[in-house]
Structure formats: structure tokens, C-alpha cells
Regions:
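Solvent-exposed interaction surfaces and binding hotspots enriched for charged
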Residues: 2-153
Length: 153
């Protein structure tokens, strides 16, 4: 049986969820920024409402916090400090769309930095694990003991 549409009712069309839209725009910004910073800035120019800009920021903040969790402790602490500074920039631009756009670009740049740091940390960890495995194999064969004895005299 078809639904009865009453006068003044949209027939099931709903407004987009502002949080979901903010997350989508944040993802778009993160896709654009590494390749074309001008296009990334232009994508934010199309957002005029402070509320919508703040939802994009919420999306970026969620990504940044998630990315930072994968960093070594010292880098994670530095990332937390940078997040505090980004919060100060956001607060200073609370009602200024142009200032909020600058905040969003800086927040997106921070995420790119976090990803770069995470990738570097993963490479270093993999290298350390490889070195440790080689060292353990050498010790098991007695090679390291002979090498250590030769260098300690």
C-alpha cells in the first residue's frame, strides 16, 4: 500500500546530516590537499556558514586524533600540543568564516604530517625488527659472540 503524503510533508526527503556532511567534506579536503592546495582552499570557499565549517573541523579533528594514536609516545605528545594550538586558532576565529577556513587548512596539513610521521615510524620499526632478527640469528650461530670478542680487545 503506498504511503499517503500529507500537505506540507516532503514525502520522505530528509536534510543531510550535518555531521556526516562535515566528515565527507573533511575527507574531500584531505584528498585534495596533497595534490593541489589551491583547489583544497577553493573547496572551503564554497562553505559560507560557520556551522558547516565547524562540522568540517569536527571531521578533521576525529581523523587527527585517530591518526595520532598510532604514533610513538613522543610524537603523540607533540601532536597533542599541535592540536591544542589548532584549538586556539579555531577559538580566535570562532565567528569568522575566513579565519575558520585557515584553521581547517592547518588542521588538514596536520593530518598529512601525522600520516607522514606514522609511515616513517612504521618503516623504522620494520627496520629495527629486521636488525633484531638478524642479530638473533647471528647470536644463535655464534657469529656475534666471535665478532664481539674481536672488537672488545
Amino acid at each position: 500500500m503506498p504511503r499517503l503524503i500529507r500537505p506540507g510533508h516532503s514525502g520522505g526527503v530528509t536534510a543531510p546530516d550535518p555531521a556526516a556532511e562535515g566528515h565527507r567534506r573533511a575527507a574531500d579536503l584531505l584528498t585534495l590537499l596533497p595534490h593541489d592546495s589551491t583547489a583544497a582552499a577553493a573547496s572551503l570557499e564554497g562553505i559560507s556558514e560557520v556551522r558547516d565549517l565547524v562540522f568540517v573541523g569536527a571531521g578533521l579533528t576525529a581523523v587527527a586524533r585517530s591518526e595520532a594514536r598510532g604514533l610513538p609516545p613522543a610524537q603523540r605528545a607533540q601532536a597533542n600540543t599541535r592540536q591544542l594550538r589548532l584549538g586556539e586558532l579555531r577559538d580566535a576565529s570562532r565567528s569568522d568564516p575566513a579565519g575558520l577556513r585557515i584553521w581547517l587548512l592547518r588542521a588538514a596539513e596536520e593530518i598529512l604530517l601525522l600520516r607522514s610521521q606514522r609511515d616513517t615510524a612504521e618503516r623504522v620499526t620494520a627496520s629495527d625488527q629486521e636488525w633484531t632478527a638478524l642479530r638473533a640469528a647471528a647470536e644463535a650461530n655464534g657469529t656475534a659472540a666471535a665478532s664481539d670478542a674481536a672488537t672488545s680487545t
